[in-house]
Amino acid sequence: SRPYLEKIKKECKKLDVKLELFYANRLGIFNMIKLVKEVIIAEENNYIYVNVASGSKIQAIACMMACMILKECTNIQPFYAEPETYAAFEGKQQSFGLKDTIPLPIYEIQTPKQKLLDALKIVYTHDKQKLTKKEMAVLAEENGIITVNAENENHSQARFASLDKNIIEPLVKQWGFIEIEKIGRNRWITITEEGKNAAEFLI
């Protein structure tokens, strides 16, 4: 791909087009989704066209998923670039020219509310990706993820109730991002594999 990149650089320079390069592991789909999301958000004041035909299938899926996740952005248009011809032999450039561009519809992908993502981030970044509900309750209140309206003598109980209803329950039952395990007198919150995958590109 290096020769093609150099050619693109030269063409952009001729046309006085600003070019920025971003690098990602081409086999890491979640890392790629996050990177595409960040680029789109950084360019939110511009019209954004996403070519899903250039690159591997993993890259195409990552680009399309990033567009679907950013459902609130109305200035994104993913498209498929249909080439004029295809290579006759393996080992050569796979396609040539541009016959047409086909706009692709964006279907919405549901994502958790921001407070749930903030809570998931606490678990994901915590030591060994687990912590007690008591620790989580304190951190959630300190970070404004939950609010507690109670007198001092009822504060701890009200904090647990708010954490359970607004954070723990949806993350466990609706999203499957965390699990609760009782060990001794403590209840431990641990992140699931699905939660780890989601954290890779949502937080």
What are these regions (language model features)?
Residues 47-53:
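Short glycine-rich phosphate-binding loop at a beta-alpha junction
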Residues 55-58:
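Polyanion-engaging groove/track-forming segments
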Residues 1-47, 61-203:
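Long, low-complexity, Lys/Arg-enriched
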